[in-house]
Amino acid sequence: MTRVLTGVLVLSLSESDFNRLADDALEEISLAVETKLDDQVEVELQEGVLTVDMADGGRYHINKHAPNQQIWLSSPKSGAWHFACSAPGAPWVSTRDADTSLGELLRDEIGAATGVYLELTL
């Protein structure tokens, strides 16, 4: 089954498939941030919630939201975002702007703040 969000066709996944995809995405972000920015940020990933505390005091809060099959992001730069997966292996795409993916948004915002641009496949 599929759904359409802001012009983006997204999958309706089984609960286990959604959790696997969302957990993989959160793990990828956590690993990339820890690897590239370990001395500049504090990272914590617990039970589907990823928190990234920036040196400038900003905090990224990223979590999976199973009822809507989305990943939600709270950004100190751009506010609240919701992302849905259009297909396994595809980027997590914004539900408000189909041209914005979770990986691109994090790469650009964290890169602008730190000078280090993350390589994310999300």
Q: What function would you assign to each model-found segment?
A:
Residues 1-11:
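N-terminal mitochondrial targeting presequence
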